[in-house]
């Protein structure tokens, strides 16, 4: 990946709705060059899709939390089955398989703390593979809008 690819990615990460011509104009390159670079980035799997950023509160998701799970027995099939179950729940946005004291972290959102409590009790306490979990309510979050490539 060269500097031109990195510049294209920066612009697309800030606003994926930009036209090819607008990106080319900003970078001072021909639109055909820009289009070919974007196609190549997609073909190489660098660009995996274009997404819309949504305010969770606008979807009645006022409370967000990270649920830290301990799973047993710890096997690929059990982890995969639980991951499939969790990601199928409408309250779940992301499932992470992690190392350390927890086996999985699940990012959820809910209309209220009461709803969150009921969701946890109804969806996870009866699952045999869940030997324990703890909840961290998210007060605020920030993320980088642009992820630049890192050098080794």
Language-model features: locations:
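A compositional/biophysical signature of low hydrophobicity enriched in polar/charged and small residues
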Residues: 1-152
């Amino acid at each position: 990946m060269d500097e031109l690819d990195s510049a294209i990615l920066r612009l697309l990460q800030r606003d994926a709705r930009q036209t090819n011509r607008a990106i080319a104009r900003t970078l001072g390159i021909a639109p055909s060059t820009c289009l070919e670079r974007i196609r190549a980035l997609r073909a190489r799997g660098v660009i995996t899709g274009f997404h819309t950023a949504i305010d969770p509160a606008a979807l009645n998701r006022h409370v967000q939390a990270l649920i830290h799970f301990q799973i047993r027995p710890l096997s690929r099939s059990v982890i995969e089955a639980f991951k499939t179950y969790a990601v199928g729940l409408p309250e779940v946005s992301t499932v992470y398989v992690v190392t350390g004291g927890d086996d999985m972290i699940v990012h959820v959102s809910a209309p209220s703390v009461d709803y969150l409590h009921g969701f946890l009790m109804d969806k996870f306490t009866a699952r045999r593979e869940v030997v324990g979990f703890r909840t961290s309510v998210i007060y605020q979050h920030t993320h980088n809008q642009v992820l630049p490539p890192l050098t080794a």
